[in-house]
A protein has these predicted regions:
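Enzymes that bind and transform nitrogen-containing heteroaromatic metabolites
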Residues: 2-19, 24-79, 95, 139, ...
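Proteins enriched for Cys/Gly/acidic motifs involved in redox and nucleic-acid/cofactor modification
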Residues: 76, 103, 170, 179, ...
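Residue-level recognition of the N-termini of beta-strands and the immediately preceding loop/turn
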Residues: 82, 123-126, 277
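Short, compositionally biased "basic patch" segments
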Residues: 85, 107-111, 115, 211-213, ...
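N-terminal glycine-rich anion-binding loops that anchor highly charged ligand groups
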Residues: 76-91
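Zn2+-dependent cytidine deaminase-like catalytic core
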Residues: 88-189, 324, 343-345
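Active-site beta-strand termini and strand-to-loop segments that position acidic
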Residues: 88, 202-203, 407-408
Length: 436
């Protein structure tokens, strides 16, 4: 891990001043497109990337800054945020790519696909990528092989990927005659984009997204138990899109017994997505076949899928995560209830939090979080706004808000209200890349 990553800067929301924005690269993934999210608030929810004119000459630092900005177009989850930029041997911009989520092309492959579609000859070209290319075959092929086969002569990367299943990309490229440069001055910026993903990978557990929806004063149900609905349709649709991008969605036995949810993922029209997450229940009370989460008695027109259900008979988060990781789950969504959120937050196991809040006040009812034993303020887990991913940190969804949060960096004593600032990198004064 880079030293003091929380004190480092990211390329921020802007390109270096020497680049002149001209066109926009929309977030156009089939599953997470701006169009799919746009209806929620009447505005595009995903970021757009300001691109320089094709053919504009970029310095090494400008090209890597652009790769970092492209990475921010991606979606958090099973894979890290990564961006890639291709220039010709003289630095003229050719193509930009980024990774849109698990199962979609990696950033390098995305940029190479754009080059193939345009008929661009990449012989002797340079590639700048925010993370060392992977060297393994998973849901997609090894990027290091694709880069070498495309004719790229020089590759620049910001941060080494030494995770178990991806390491070795730079070494492979060198073995194929590609000149590889490590741009260490950008390493912390790349790490900061994916800090919690690297932690999850090192701990050999899924990346965890927790979701909660509450009133302004923090209740998820009234005193009599009624809760449908606190948030409006836009927020609920957004929650289903998070389910859709996760490998598994998990609730506790109490929520299962009280609410009897289906835990399926549906689109804005209420139709089930073809890809459905594994439905997981954590707890020691056996969930019988009559509960909808088991998938044995689906609604009319929906096929039964009991094989897509798993109950883990434990109250130990680590035991649950070990079981899911062994089954190939790399992105887990915690849907509820409040005890689950508190339990995982207390163990510092939440990597991303999406909190929906409705303009409603109850004064009493069921709290959004419990089982979090905080006796004094210093013990409370600290979160901070997530400005680095695909979405703005706070979005308006109809009459509700969605706040995107990540834990404060480990090992920091963050005061209330303190936040990592993200100024621009000064491309004019960054050192030249090191050749290794």
């Amino acid at each position: 891990m880079p030293q003091n990553p929380s004190q480092e800067v990211l390329a921020g929301a802007h390109l270096p001043a020497t680049l002149t924005p001209s066109t926009h690269l929309p977030h156009n993934d089939l599953d997470y497109s701006a169009a799919e999210y746009g209806h929620l608030a009447g505005l595009p929810a995903a970021r757009t990337l300001n691109l320089p004119d094709p053919g504009q000459t970029l310095s090494h630092d400008e090209a890597m800054s652009l790769a970092l900005q492209a990475a921010r177009q991606g979606i958090r989850g099973a894979n890290p945020l990564v961006g890639a930029v291709i220039t010709d041997r003289d630095g003229h911009l050719l193509h930009v790519g980024y990774h849109r989520g698990a199962g979609t092309p990696h950033a390098e492959a995305d940029a190479l696909a754009a080059a193939r579609a345009a008929g661009t000859d990449l012989t002797g070209a340079r590639m700048y990528v925010s993370l060392e290319p992977c060297n393994h075959t998973g849901r997609t092929g090894p990027c290091s092989h694709a880069v070498a086969e495309a004719g790229i002569s020089e590759l620049y990367y910001a941060y080494s990927d030494d995770t178990e299943n991806a390491a070795g990309g730079a070494a492979y490229l060198r073995s194929q005659g590609v000149t590889v440069h490590a741009m260490e001055e950008f390493a912390n910026a790349s790490y900061l984009l994916n800090e919690r993903w690297f932690i999850a990978a090192a701990e050999r557990r899924p990346f965890i997204t927790a979701k909660s929806a509450s009133t302004l004063d923090g209740f998820i149900a009234a005193a009599d138990g009624t809760s449908k609905w606190i948030t409006g349709p836009a927020a609920r649709i957004d929650g289903h899109l998070i389910r859709h991008r996760a490998d598994a969605v998990m609730i506790g036995t109490r929520t299962t017994l009280m609410d009897d949810p289906t835990l399926d993922a549906r689109d804005a029209n209420g139709e089930r997505f073809e890809k459905q997450p594994l439905r997981v229940v954590m707890g020691k009370t056996e969930i019988t076949e009559n509960y909808r989460v088991r998938g044995l008695n689906p609604p009319e027109g929906v096929e039964a899928d009991p094989q897509n259900f798993l109950q883990v008979f434990t109250h130990d988060p680590r035991e649950l995560l070990d079981e899911l990781y062994a089954r190939g789950v790399r992105h887990l969504m915690i849907e509820g209830g409040p005890g689950m959120v508190g339990l995982f937050a207390g163990e510092d196991l939440i990597d991303e939090m999406v909190w929906y809040r409705a303009p409603m006040i109850m004064g009493q009812g069921k709290s959004a979080v419990y089982r979090l034993l905080v006796d004094t303020l210093a013990q409370a887990p600290r979160l901070q706004l997530d400005d680095l991913g695909m979405f703005p940190a706070v979005r308006v969804l109809g009459n509700d808000t969605a706040t995107h949060l990540v834990p404060a960096p480990r090992g920091t004593a963050q005061e209330p209200g303190e936040r990592r600032t993200l100024p621009k990198l000064d491309a004019c004064h960054a050192p030249e890349p090191r050749l290794d």
